Amino acid sequence: MYEIKRIFSKNIIVLCIVAIILNIIVYTGMQLNGMTLGEFRKREILSEETDDIQIKKQTAYIKGYNKYIADVIDNSEEMKNRKIFSSKTRYSYNNIIVTQREYEKMRGITLAQENNKSLESYLEYENTSIVVMLLLIIIIFNMFRERNNSMWIQVYSSKNGRTRLMLRRIGTIFVGTFILNFVANISVFVTSVILYGKNANMNSYIQNLMMFKDFTYPISKFQYVTLLYICQIFVCFTLSLLVFSLFAYTRKRVTASLIIGLICSVEWLIYNTSSKGTVINQLKAYNILNIIACNSILSRHNTLSIFGIVEKDI
C-alpha cells in the first residue's frame, strides 16, 4: 500500500487530472473548429434538418452494403481460380481464402440509418490512448526515484526484495492502465454526447458507421466499444511492461528516457518519410501510434503471414 501511495503521489494524481482535462479541451476544440459552443449547437440543429448530402450518402452506403460484401466474395472466388493465384502455398492465394471466409460472415446483415455522430466522433479521436500512454511512462519514471539515492541497494539486496517490488509495481501499472483508460475514454465519450446528442441504438451493428465497412465481425456498437477498451488496456499494459523492463535494466532513468525518445523518433521518421511501395512503408499500418490507438487497426480488414500461415491480423 505504501508503494502505491508513493507512486501515485498527489503530484502524479494532479498531473493525470490535468492531462485528462486538457485532452477533453483538445477534443472539444477539434470538434468546434473555431466556433463557439452556441454556434456549434446551432449548426448541428440546422444540419439535422438540412444535411441532405450526408443523409443521401448514408442511405447509399446502407443500400449498397450487402452488394459490396457480395462483390468482395465474388471477386475473391474469381481471383482464386486464376492461374497467377493458383499456388496454394503462396501468400496471395491464402490471403484470398481468408478474405473470402471473413467477408462471408457479413452476408445478409441488416443496417439502419441512424444518428451516430457522437460515437463516430469519439472513435475518430485517437489522442486519448496516447495521453494515457504518456502518463504511464511518467508514472513508471516516478517508480524508479530510488535510483537517485542508495535506497535501491537495500531493497534489492534484501530477501526476495527485488521480486516483491517488481510484482507490486507490475500490479500498480495494470491498475493504473485500467483506471486511466477508463476515466480518459469515458470523459471523451460523455463530451461527444454533450456536443452531438445521444447516440442511436448501441445494440445495432457497428457496420452502421461507414468507417466500419471492412470490419468483418458482426457485433454491436456497444460490443465494439467494449472490445476497443479491452484492446487499449492490453496494448497500453504491454507497452508499459516494455518501458518498465527498460527502466529496470538501465541504471539511470535519463538513459531509459533517451532510448524511448530515440525509438519514438525513428518511428516518426519511418511514418513520415518512407515512400509508397517500399517494405518499410508497410510498417505504417502497424506503427506505434496506430497500435496504441487500436481503432485504426481494428476497424479495417487486413491479413498477416506468420510462418507461412495467413490469418486476419486481429
Segments predicted by a language model, with ranges:
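Aromatic- and glycine-rich beta-strand/loop motifs that create alpha-glucan
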Residues: 1-16, 20, 167-169
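Central hydrophobic cores of alpha-helical transmembrane segments
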Residues: 17-19, 254-267, 285-286
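Secretory targeting signals
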Residues: 23-53, 57, 72, 95-146, ...
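Membrane topogenic helices and adjacent juxtamembrane segments
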Residues: 62, 68-106
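Alpha-helical transmembrane segments and their immediate interhelical loop/hinge regions
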Residues: 151, 162, 166-167
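Short helix-to-coil transition segments within interhelical loops
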Residues: 156-162
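Extracellular/periplasmic helix-loop-helix junctions in multi-pass membrane proteins
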Residues: 273-287, 303-313
